[in-house]
């Protein structure tokens, strides 16, 4: 499912649907992180999993070989979660309602997609190496 969301994000980028890129990229990262959390029998129905990721995954010694990558993964998870609502719903900012359609541009969307791909690649590798899950 996380991979499907990455594909959707890539297609949205090609179609200049930048808020959709952000939405699908965030969703992909959340899903792959929750897959790893599920392997530890820990699941919470929230969108910002960065703190849970830290407590459950990063503090577990069996994942110590991934510490450097996990620092970036956690940073990206938090950053992507910040955009969860903003990529989906209008938000009042400075007395003005800002639509997701007006919030993001091509460069921002491409950067978001790269961050989501990093999260996906790292966590898929961990799922494969630690838990013998390949997709």
Identify the residue ranges that each predicted region occupies.
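Terminal alpha-helical segments
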Residues: 1-135
């Amino acid at each position: 499912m996380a991979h499907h969301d990455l594909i959707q994000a890539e297609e949205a980028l090609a179609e200049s649907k930048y808020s959709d890129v952000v939405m699908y990229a965030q969703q992909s990262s959340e899903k792959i992180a929750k897959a790893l959390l599920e392997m530890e029998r820990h699941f919470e129905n929230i969108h910002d999993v960065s703190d849970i990721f830290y407590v459950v995954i990063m503090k577990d010694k069996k994942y110590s070989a991934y510490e450097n990558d996990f620092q970036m993964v956690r940073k990206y998870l938090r950053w992507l979660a910040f955009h969860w609502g903003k990529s989906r719903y209008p938000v009042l900012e400075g007395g003005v309602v800002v639509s997701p359609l007006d919030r993001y541009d091509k460069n921002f969307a491409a950067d978001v997609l790269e961050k989501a791909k990093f999260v996906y690649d790292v966590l898929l590798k961990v799922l494969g190496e630690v838990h013998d899950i390949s997709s």
